[in-house]
């Protein structure tokens, strides 16, 4: 499944803010989009609107609006968390810094690669890092899932231990977690952030392995303007 949280997490600690994460959203259809709206959070004084539509190309477009429901200015970044099944290979283009390096990743071909093995992650480990391009990809079997988003410069990322990219691994699943720009919102103001989901079958002649230049090229083609 997939959810949305406000970043940084240290502002609301744990567990996730229920109004944004697990409580029911109100939903309505507007044109070709499904629009889902949360209640205002209590521990994080924000609300979220999710606008979802399928594009002509067959991709899924997700537009998130994060609104400051507080009476004072507050700084937040949008944060999408998508859980995929155990196993698989995750990768993104390596950026300027790694913030949290708990996962055993490999750096090859200008990219950071994580091959999930549920036996080696204990109770959960995380990587947070900058990316050099606005995508985060994951291969399961021969299906490639790519999230595309605006690349966020270091100066616009949420404070450490947050970062533009996070990969969280537990024994039974992996989380793919991009974040948008960190900005101050006046009371009642909103910020909008867009993520595209692409799916593609990996051709049989492409090896699914750490460092695969062909996999990187396929992800680049899917996210090309």
Residue spans of the language-model regions?
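Surface-exposed acidic/polar loop and edge beta-strand patches at domain peripheries
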Residues: 1-61, 69-225
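Beta-strand-loop-alpha "switch" segments that mediate conformational coupling across diverse proteins
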Residues: 64
């Amino acid at each position: 499944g997939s959810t949305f949280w406000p970043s940084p997490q240290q502002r609301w600690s744990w567990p996730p803010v229920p109004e944004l994460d697990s409580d029911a959203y109100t939903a309505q259809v507007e044109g070709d989009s499904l629009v889902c709206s949360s209640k205002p959070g209590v521990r994080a004084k924000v609300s979220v609107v999710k606008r979802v539509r399928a594009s002509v190309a067959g991709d899924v477009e997700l537009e998130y609006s994060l609104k400051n429901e507080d009476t004072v200015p507050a700084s937040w970044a949008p944060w999408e968390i998508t859980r995929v099944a155990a196993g698989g290979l995750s990768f993104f283009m390596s950026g300027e810094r790694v913030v949290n390096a708990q996962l055993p990743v490999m750096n090859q071909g200008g990219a950071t690669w994580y091959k999930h093995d549920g036996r080696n992650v204990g109770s959960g480990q995380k990587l947070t890092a900058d990316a050099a391009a606005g995508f985060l990809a994951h291969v399961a079997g021969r299906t490639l899932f790519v999230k595309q988003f605006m690349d966020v410069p270091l100066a616009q990322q949420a404070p450490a231990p947050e970062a533009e990219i996070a990969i969280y691994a537990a024994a039974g699943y992996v989380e793919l977690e991009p974040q948008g720009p960190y900005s101050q919102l006046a009371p009642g103001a909103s910020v909008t952030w867009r993520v595209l989901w692409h799916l593609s079958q990996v051709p049989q002649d492409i090896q699914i392995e750490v460092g695969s230049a062909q996999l990187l090229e396929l992800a680049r083609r899917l996210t090309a303007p």
